[in-house]
């Protein structure tokens, strides 16, 4: 087990991976293309997915520029909305960025009515008129706050005709950059929040949360960060952030690798051990590579990996044990682990064998221009 210093870096890495566009490095003007995978015939596959509930979920950000292909996703989680709190009193929530961006995503339901769109809430602050980060902690200290938040969520879902709420509180009881938190009560209060959401939204809308990978039972017997067992009765599924689990020279999203601090298999097993059914678990796929948590570049989008200077880096090196590719320098040093169609296929097959619900990815715009990874996720889920 690595020390607390590494754990804090791991948490910081998850925050970068889950809530922001990773840094890019210098690029070759003519990137070497990936082989564009043939996509499984979408309509028949989608009909089958609808009947058995499989998930191919894309996180789509407010700062992205692309409009997703509505026929190679089953779910879109729109990132993000943020909470407004003043002196401990809930004031409401707002979308981050421009409303027009969100509305353009919602409009995709006109071409594919089966598409599910959920609004994802962040603990962070991006809007210039909002001053308090970490507002989940303050929100959850008042039953009235939580009730009014849930009512606002319901009104928003009805207004836009979308399908659910996704919560991305990273993480209860932990402070980032001075964000409000209360380690004594945040974990338990998070359960109360999803309970209130379920009571208000009923069974007509989906509720999910972004699951932390290294949560475990603390020495006191309680849970640190997220009480995954306590949350389970109130959520439809968990989007497990199986990425940013280590840094170079290890893989950050290995399928199974005892050399890494954590891997996908161990993260999923923690949820199964807590009593969460496999068919409520969605495996996370990063569309970026992780180099470091503290040194530049910290992370590199997939499209930038393809554009790395081929005279300085070798990509598509394969690690059989981790079932993931990596980039190495021409001197043979491990630069970053990442995912490609081969590793996504392996993860999809593993998830199906475990009886999991499907795959999700962060995030749509980090793929290459051909949509190589998006198509690979769709194919892996629809096999």
Regions found by a protein language model. Give the residues of each.
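Sec-dependent signal peptide recognition
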Residues: 2-9
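C-terminal motif of bacterial Sec signal peptides marking the signal peptidase cleavage site
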Residues: 15-18
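Bacterial signal peptide processing site
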Residues: 20-23
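Glycan-recognition patch characteristic of GH18 chitinases/ENGases
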Residues: 32-157, 256-261
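Surface-exposed amphipathic alpha-helices with a cationic face
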Residues: 46-51, 102-118, 122-125, 191-207, ...
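Conserved, mostly hydrophobic/aromatic
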Residues: 76, 119, 167, 197, ...
